[in-house]
């Protein structure tokens, strides 16, 4: 075979490979989007909950789906204990924390947070039949106070117990268990985020109530691993675009957060 024939045959093979690669690239578009694992604790409505099918649901789920769509990536949701969210993020078990988490200075030492997506605050809730406790100042050395593990409210009541201001700080893995004990009188009060407490009030009509003013202000953020600027930028850009388009406000309204 002549050199020219060899050259023609070689060129044909190269062209065929190039065409194949082009078709493969086109065919994989969309199916090859980056997938990020999002961790959340599902007893924190309306931010994080489960629907009637048992699937993770809530404002944070809808928000992350909308950000992912806007920024061209995909998300998978994982249910974790609240206390394990930051640990899971640092270990690489999850890529994102979207669970109504306060971007506190202490947490910022371990996590990079997005721009604020919601301003919340802690409130005191009591049994609806309790007319003695009207604010946090009415909690005393006979009071058993509940909070969820790993939260700012847990830190607060543990400090109150240490200082002798309350009898016992009862820490729960899940908020709904704390609400149940509040209803049956096992604890005197529950300290928790206002939107979440209001959601449980609506579900348990006439059984619990909020007393006094909010105790603080907490800016909620979406967390990523320290130094993951690429992912953080995507989340912040997505948030900004959703707010600009009006989609963010629609989600707030859907979950009664407006």
PLM region spans:
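Short helices/loops that flank or line small-molecule/ion binding pockets
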Residues: 69, 83-96, 110-112, 137-138, ...
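Extracytoplasmic small-molecule ligand-binding "clamshell" domains
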Residues: 32-100
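C-terminal motif of bacterial Sec signal peptides marking the signal peptidase cleavage site
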Residues: 21-25
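Acidic, polar ligand-binding/catalytic clefts
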Residues: 65, 74-138, 208, 214
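A ligand-binding cleft/hinge motif common to bilobed small-molecule-binding domains
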Residues: 101-109, 156-160, 181-184, 188-217
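Ligand-binding clefts/hinges and TM-proximal coupling segments of bilobed small-molecule sensing domains
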Residues: 28-30, 76, 152-170, 209-211, ...
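Periplasmic-binding protein-like
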Residues: 42, 119-126, 198, 202-237, ...
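Extended ligand-binding regions for polar small-molecule ligands
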Residues: 61-70, 130, 137, 149-151, ...
């Amino acid at each position: 075979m002549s050199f020219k024939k060899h050259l023609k045959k070689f060129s044909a093979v190269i062209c065929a490979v190039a065409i194949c690669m082009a078709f493969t690239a086109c065919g994989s578009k969309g199916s090859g989007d980056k997938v990020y694992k999002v961790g959340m604790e599902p007893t924190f409505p309306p931010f994080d909950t489960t629907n009637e099918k048992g699937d993770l649901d809530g404002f944070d789920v809808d928000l992350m789906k909308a950000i992912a769509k806007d920024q061209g990536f995909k998300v998978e949701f994982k249910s974790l204990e609240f206390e394990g969210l930051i640990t899971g993020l640092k270990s690489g078990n999850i890529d994102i924390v979207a669970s109504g988490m306060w971007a506190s200075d202490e947490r910022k030492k371990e996590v990079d947070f997005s721009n604020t997506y919601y301003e919340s605050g802690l409130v005191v809730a009591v049994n609806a039949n309790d007319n003695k406790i009207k604010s946090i100042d009415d909690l005393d050395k006979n009071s058993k106070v509940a909070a969820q593990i790993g939260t700012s409210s847990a830190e607060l009541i543990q400090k109150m117990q240490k200082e002798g201001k309350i009898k016992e700080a009862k820490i729960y893995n899940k908020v709904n268990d704390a609400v149940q004990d509040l209803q049956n009188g096992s604890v005197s009060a529950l300290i928790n985020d206002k939107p979440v407490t209001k959601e449980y009030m609506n579900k348990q009509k006439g059984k619990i109530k909020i007393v006094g003013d909010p105790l603080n202000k907490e800016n909620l953020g979406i967390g990523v691993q320290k130094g993951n600027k690429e992912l953080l930028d995507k989340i912040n850009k997505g948030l900004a675009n959703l707010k600009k388009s009006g989609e963010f406000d629609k989600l707030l309204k859907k979950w009664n957060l407006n």
